[in-house]
């Protein structure tokens, strides 16, 4: 990887993070874990933004995971990470609201509080339901979900693992493979990318992977000049609309399962038209960061070889 491409990647990601922070001024509130010990990090087996797919009476439904799944034995006590009022209570979940518009949802628990109850910080809310083995923690602000693992939110949390860009594929817009040594016309780029949890969940979820917080790509000519680049995926602070699910996740993506890691396949580039680019050698680089900006990259060499006009 050329050394001068790393600053470009970090500058792009930093700019995206700054822009999001300016648009989301509520991002600075830190809170503890919902299970004991409150002051220690816990294993997570399902990450924010990971691919969720299931079937119901209306057919297939796909959606981004809107919280984090914190591993906890069935029956584990679950506590409020912030004081507030119980604004929603179901047989398997509780949502606590704050006057600021922030809400915290606790799913897959048997509640011990009622709707309208004022709860204190670290007040008992319920216990993990049999067969679930985790509590799903969701944070939202005025109806928009936030990433609990972003800096300054779920605390303490540290991550020193690097995301992995496992492979990169060049395809036609119709999905046919493209030989990277002979690239013509418009192309799509698909990549397998994942992050390793800083704390491995207990078996059978010990192979779990995280979705990266951000995915980025760039196309650099043989002269070292970046001719195209973009941020392709951004789960760093919030979620895209579920209507963009198939724009971001490629077919074959799925969440973590017992004894089986999740498969995170991303559409990094849609319809990159090479016809206006000079023929020659290029480097396509794909990078990913987690919420602590640990960076993993991979690249593939392309040769653009469009036929001469006329």
Language-model-detected regions and their locations in the chain:
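Secretory N-termini
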Residues: 92-97, 103, 113, 300-301
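A short macromolecule-binding patch
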Residues: 102-110, 147
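Long, low-complexity serine/threonine/glycine- and acidic-rich segments characteristic of extracellular
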Residues: 158, 163, 173-308
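Bacterial N-terminal signal peptides that target proteins for export
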Residues: 2-13
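Well-ordered beta-strand positions in beta-sheet-rich domains
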Residues: 77, 103-105, 118, 297-301
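Acidic, glycine-anchored pre-beta loop/turn
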Residues: 110-123
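Surface-exposed, glycine-biased beta-strand/turn segments
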Residues: 26-94, 99, 120-124, 130-135, ...
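Bacterial N-terminal signal peptides
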Residues: 14-25
